[in-house]
Amino acid sequence: MRMNKFYMPTLREDPQDAEIASHKLLLRAGMIRKTAAGLYSYLPLGYRIVRKVENIVREEMDNYGSQEIHMPITQPREIWEESGRWKTFGPEMFKLKDRNNREFCLGPTAEEYFTDLVKGEIKSYKQLPLNIYQIQTKYRDEKRPRFGINRSREFLMQDAYTFDVNEEAMGEAYMNMWRAYEVVFNRLGLEYKIVAGDSGAMGGNSSHEFIALSDVGEGVICYSDDSDFAATDEKAYVYYQVNDENVEKLSSEKVLTPNCKTIEEVSDFLNVDAAHCLKAVDLMVEGKPVIVFIPGDRELNMSKLVSYLKCPEHEIEMMEEQDILALNSSPGFTGPIGLDCRIIIDSRVKQMKNFVVGANEENYHIKNVNYGDDFEGEIVEDLLMVQEGDIDPETKSPLKFKRGIEVGNIFQLGQKYSKSMNATFLDENGKEQFFWMGSYGIGVTRSVSAIVEQNHDDKGMIWPLVVAPYHVIITIVNTKDEEQNTLAEKLYEKLLLQGVEVLLDDRKERVGVKFNDRDLIGIPLRITVGKKAAEDIVEFSERRTLENVEMSSTEAYEKVMEIINSNLKSVGGLYR
């Protein structure tokens, strides 16, 4: 492609609303443009990258036995009512009506669509297993879209679904797709970790997330170097020791604690460690009061609570002051004794002795409280958020923490959707059975963002060869020099004949502008044709190292072909 005709509107400065490197650089390089909050257009360079990621995903899905289909973006309300998710999915779902007042949504995911399709077509165990996928636009009305295409309202995603005869076969399909996803992310050149994840609104019994490591990632993972333990901070079990076995229980006592509303204030005033000052989290769950009590030195893990309550997270809100007063309690002084509402307690509280709780009266707490003697509630094994200093439950070694971007996820759905939507087949005995399902997703456009986050410097992006918009850029230093033009054209045509994807910078621009743009857009292999063109000498460099080496045009051509042939399975076919 000749750049004098190429649509690549680069920017010299970072856009003001861009927060992270990928957002800044993709905008500056003229690869994307913001249309509205969370909505982006992909320009020629950017769209080539998206298509390459998409095609890598497509090839590995095909290699691992998944068949591609294409389904509508618009999904009817009826199938979401069948699954029970029309109301529970939450405000992230875009909803609309047609001219006949029939309700639809813009698909945020596709479990319902795929289940509805298969239940009408697959009737016998002889037609199983089935593995089908699509690469399609998804929509989620994010409350706060940010970070460019990393968290947008409209995004491209691959979603696959497996249908099997039993739980064992579902597990085999799950591991097959696990391996396929590993190959995809390895080919994309991402540094990532696979961690146990929270199933959330998807449901199911088991899930894992593929997290591309990045300091700007919104997700946090924890892992151990001494075992296979790895999980998101939402999923990780907290190994929290309470050493009160030999402590003698004391009699409870109401004490004055003027203006002590926080754990820190109560701990300091009563000279009691923070862990033994019970933290009350005052919530309204589906309109009803629920108080959660946990050790005072920890934070409540909302994902674990949602999993226990089995209700949508958007149905859980913090209590307003009037809600607390209606319970005959006092804001900042809520305690479990005498409360007439649902009480949920982390199991570690049951093991503690002589802790402090709010007295449900302003400026008062009760000390030396003990579970079972003074109050009771629903015990949940683990409601705590993992934090620095926690240890691996298996090896007791300290956990390590890293931030990351979720680029893929896999779920064992079991029979959640087949049962709710009555999707069945006949087994070998002629008996009706529900499908065992798996769900799998790769964020195609989010993967593009993650690749940039892991591959950039202060000059611009550094694309891995496999997803680069072009393999090579040839820069003509002076387009008024006929010998430079001739040599550049010769190299350009020669590489094109081999199926190499080449950008020829033949613009009538200052050479500094050309070099800056070249660094910014991050084409991995670079040939500069300059003042030594008459001697058949060019400069070759790689974007990752920026080291310029003079060589003949033939040597430069051979160098390009050597690198491409060693890095790509094929050129000009698979990745075009």
Swiss-Prot record:
InterPro entries: aa-tRNA-synt_IIb, aa-tRNA-synth_II, aa-tRNA-synth_II/BPL/LPL, Anticodon-bd, Anticodon-bd_dom_sf, Pro-tRNA-ligase_IIa, Pro-tRNA-synth_IIa_bac-type, Pro-tRNA-Synthase_IIa_type1. Keywords: Aminoacyl-tRNA synthetase, ATP-binding, Cytoplasm, Ligase, Nucleotide-binding, Protein biosynthesis. Gene3D superfamilies: Anticodon-binding domain, Bira Bifunctional Protein, Domain 2. Its main location: cytoplasm. Its EC number is 6.1.1.15. One of its GO terms (molecular function) is aminoacyl-tRNA deacylase activity. It comes from the Bacteria. The keyword Ribosomal protein does not apply. Signal peptide: none annotated. GO terms for cellular component: cytosol. It is found in: Cytoplasm. It catalyses: tRNA(Pro) + L-proline + ATP = L-prolyl-tRNA(Pro) + AMP + diphosphate. It is an enzyme of class 6 (ligase). GO terms for biological process: prolyl-tRNA aminoacylation. Belongs to the class-II aminoacyl-tRNA synthetase family. ProS type 1 subfamily. Consists of three domains: the N-terminal catalytic domain, the editing domain and the C-terminal anticodon-binding domain. NCBIfam families: PRK09194.1, proS_fam_II. Catalyzes the attachment of proline to tRNA(Pro) in a two-step reaction: proline is first activated by ATP to form Pro-AMP and then transferred to the acceptor end of tRNA(Pro). As ProRS can inadvertently accommodate and process non-cognate amino acids such as alanine and cysteine, to avoid such errors it has two additional distinct editing activities against alanine. One activity is designated as 'pretransfer' editing and involves the tRNA(Pro)-independent hydrolysis of activated Ala-AMP. Homodimer. This is Proline--tRNA ligase. It comes from Finegoldia magna (strain ATCC 29328 / DSM 20472 / WAL 2508). The lineage of its organism: Bacteria, Bacillati, Bacillota, Tissierellia, Tissierellales.
